[in-house]
C-alpha cells in the first residue's frame, strides 16, 4: 500500500476555492499536510479554511493574482515564514472562455488563456520549486486536458493555454530529474460535479471523473512510492492517450 502520509509537509493548493480545490484540500488535510490555500478571493479561501476545521498552525490563506510574479513571490515568503518549507504544489488554476473558431478568435482570447494557464504556472514554479530543490524533495502537480495534445475544433485558445502549460511542466520535469522533485500532470475531460450535471443532465458521463478520484491520484503521486513517476501525463478519462 502506498504511503500517502504527508505529515508535516506543506502543500500549496492554487485555485483552492473551486470544487476540485475544496475536495483536494480536505484529502490532503486528512493525510496530515499543512495547507496554504491560494486564490483570488480571500473570503472564499477563509470560508474553505473554516470548513476544514484545521488548527491555525496548519493552515494559511493567501489571496493573490497568481499570474503576477511579484505577488507570487510574496506568497512564497508568507508560506516559508509560517511553515518553513514548501513541499507540494497542486495547480488547479485555469479557466475557459467558451467555444470560438480559430478565424474568429481575438488575440485577447489567447492572451487570457495564456495568462490563466501558462503565466500563473510559470510564476508559481519559479517561486516555489527552488525551496523544493533545496530540500531535495518536492511534487509539482497540475490538472490539464487531453485537448492540449488533441485539440478539437472551436477551442483553440483553451488548447493553446493548456498545451503551453504542459510544455512548461514537462520541461521542468527534465530539469529536476533525479533531484527528489517531480513534475506531473493529470488529464481530465469533465469533472463530475453538481453544476456540471445541471449544464449537461443527459450526458452518459462515461469519461467524467469525480474530484475524489482526482484527489486520490494526486495523493498517490505525492507518495514515496511514486518518486520515480516524473514527466507523466496521466489520463483520467477512461481512454488511452
Regions picked out by a protein language model, each given a short descriptive name:
Residues 73, 77, 81, 96-111, ...:
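Conserved mid-core segment of classical short-chain dehydrogenase/reductases
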Residues 178-181, 185-189, 193, 201-241:
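C-terminal helical subdomain
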Residues 87, 103-123, 137, 141, ...:
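Catalytic Tyr-X3-Lys loop
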Residues 33-47:
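Conserved glycine-rich Rossmann-like NAD(P)H-binding loop of the short-chain dehydrogenase/reductase
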Residues 113, 139-164, 169-178, 190:
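Catalytic loop of short-chain dehydrogenase/reductase
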Residues 77, 81, 116-135, 173-174, ...:
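Amphipathic alpha-helical dimer-interface segment in Rossmann-like NAD(P)H-dependent oxidoreductases
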Residues 14, 86-94, 117, 142, ...:
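Rossmann-fold scaffold of SDR-type NAD(P)-dependent oxidoreductases
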Residues 17-19:
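Conserved glycine-rich cofactor-binding loop
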